[in-house]
Amino acid sequence: MNGLTFAVPRGALFAETLDLLDRLGLDTAEVRANDRKLLFEDAGLVTMRPSDVPTYVEAGAADLGITGKDVLAEHPERDVYELLDLGFGPCRMVFATVAGEDRAAEALRRLGVMRVATKYPRIASAYFERTGRQAEIVQVKGSVELAPLTGLAEAIVDLTATGTTLRENGLVVREEIAVATARLIANPVAHKLKAEAIDDVVGRLRAG
């Protein structure tokens, strides 16, 4: 589209991102038909994990990208412009513990510190600093819900859309930290050199 390359997130935001690109006039049929192919040069699309989108956009491998606000908040060092809140894919960043007695609160009372497992160490650290609580952050990559069930941590900070996975693992939300939605981001150089094309995209998205 007007010579622009888009970084497209696979996963939870994938389907709605493709629908949005369809509305912009891009042909996403090949993307929808190929689960394993990642680069679609004719359409100007490259697909990847949401957490990689800011990296590719910052490096100029893509002019524009779509990713969650959670990714941007966890990686503030990425030099990208956040252009638009796209409004879809809402998820809550939450502080959760095992149902029943709040083990995290008990640990704070007894020890002055609680252990919190998360994939989002920066977001978690900033939150507990902001709320005046001592937390030892344990970074994990996989199923965060396991941590309080196995004794690795008293609590977790994680992203949830429906809360189903938390409930199925006997966890309850104690606090909501933030709500994250999909955002449109741009490479700073492309934002200058391809301003007309990018402004057109932003204008059309704002117009719905």
Name each model-derived stretch.
Residues 1-208:
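Domain-level signature for soluble enzymes in the chorismate/prephenate branch of the shikimate pathway
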